[in-house]
Amino acid sequence: MGNGVQPLDPVAIQIGSISVKWYGVIIASAVVIALLLALSEANKRKMDKEIIVDLLIWAIPISIISARIYYVIFEWDFYKNNLGEIVKIWHGGIAIYGALIGAVLTAIIFSRIKKISFWQLADVVAPSLIIAQAIGRWGNFMNQEAHGAETTRSFLESLHLPDFIINQMYIDGAYYQPTFLYESLWNVLGFIVLLIIRRTKIRRGELFLGYVIWYSFGRFFIEGMRTDSLMWGDFRVSQVLSLLLIVLSIGIIIYRRMKMNPPYYMEDKFGKVVKKK
């Protein structure tokens, strides 16, 4: 590559003709970490851990499929003439919001089958979701995707970024905004916020809704910086959906507090979750 800048090798392991890319390794790591965290959260809420494992078994493949369908719908001008590409997910093209929609629908159906509270289940997995997204964005980093507009090396250096990040943002002769990093850091901060607010008097389901609000708020602004947004006419799909999710989540919180009076949770000083009315 010109300018003496070399990107990181996207292949983690190469065995003959078989290659394992860092993207897959990072996503798999995110899933494992999310599972371990969710199991810990389930234990705090005295929920059967097998419920979390069973949910994950269903949610992972369904989320991948829904993430792909979401992407294909908004890139239909390409896929309608290349139908064979629809199933070639390894060529890229999945969307986090599509995955989230699939995961939520799976959890709703799963909770009804298991006869447990969807909101309780959602609260258990909320911290796992946001930390998994924070980790997963580094897969985009390794693939040199999900970046922002063109910028300069001096600007990136002014952010005090390590050289390996700056060099990885050098793509086809130009430097780009590391929007993957902005979103990853936003999600890490969101994870910390969730850990803090669950020590306050919040109602069942509000930890999950807080996650949705936090992620959507950050995604709205970060999406405006990206160059690969899915579009709906003149609008960025993720920005529209972010606004809708923020309004919907706030509306659900207000409605449930006024009409349903759900129980609230707090953590004690030992990190155990206690339920009160």
Curated annotation (Swiss-Prot):
Lineage top rank: taxon: Bacteria
A GO BP annotation: lipoprotein biosynthetic process
UniProt keyword annotation of Protein biosynthesis present: no
Keyword match Transmembrane helix: yes
Family: Belongs to the Lgt family.
Protein function: Catalyzes the transfer of the diacylglyceryl group from phosphatidylglycerol to the sulfhydryl group of the N-terminal cysteine of a prolipoprotein, the first step in the formation of mature lipoproteins.
Protein name stated in the entry: Phosphatidylglycerol--prolipoprotein diacylglyceryl transferase
Provenance organism: Listeria monocytogenes serotype 4b (strain CLIP80459)
Gene name, Swiss-Prot/TrEMBL: lgt
